[in-house]
Amino acid sequence: NPDNLPGERKDPYTIILPPPNVTGTLHTGHAIMLAIQDTLIRFKRMQGYKTLWLPGTDHAAIATQSVVEKKIQKEEGKSRHDLGREETLRRINDFALDAQKTIISQFRSMGASLDWSRLAFTIDEKRNLAVRTMFKKMYDDGIIYRGYRIVNWDPKGQTTISDDEIVYQEEKTKLYYLTYG
């Protein structure tokens, strides 16, 4: 916590850790990113800055749901429809919390100088309220609106997904022409 650092500190220097998804464990890319940010925050602290490095994890809703559904299908041969909404949500939440504990443990074992007193989870009450409040404000201001648009539909997940989540696959297929008249 920068408020507990010894001596007189000058300007603040803050890094918000890009929150890893709770879909599994950390990989080499996370470790590299952590090492770079840790080096920056420690260097600025040695220069006398009031440093703050905020930790957190991302619930990654659709991705986490997909991982859990695949696990349930593999281990039990059941779908989310077989389990029902409440049981599926409970299992997704349990998985996410377990993965979050593992990720935090990995961060700590790497010696990251994060301010653990300010740990955030993108679906915790404080963040959830902030997102809903801002979403409503943006809707009221006309920035977010409902319109007729082409969307990416995931038939397996039965939901819309963003362009970033699409895996494009080129295929050679036939093209048919229809002539009218």
Segments predicted by a language model, with ranges:
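N-terminal, positively charged nucleic-acid-binding surface of large information/translation enzymes
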Residues: N1-G181
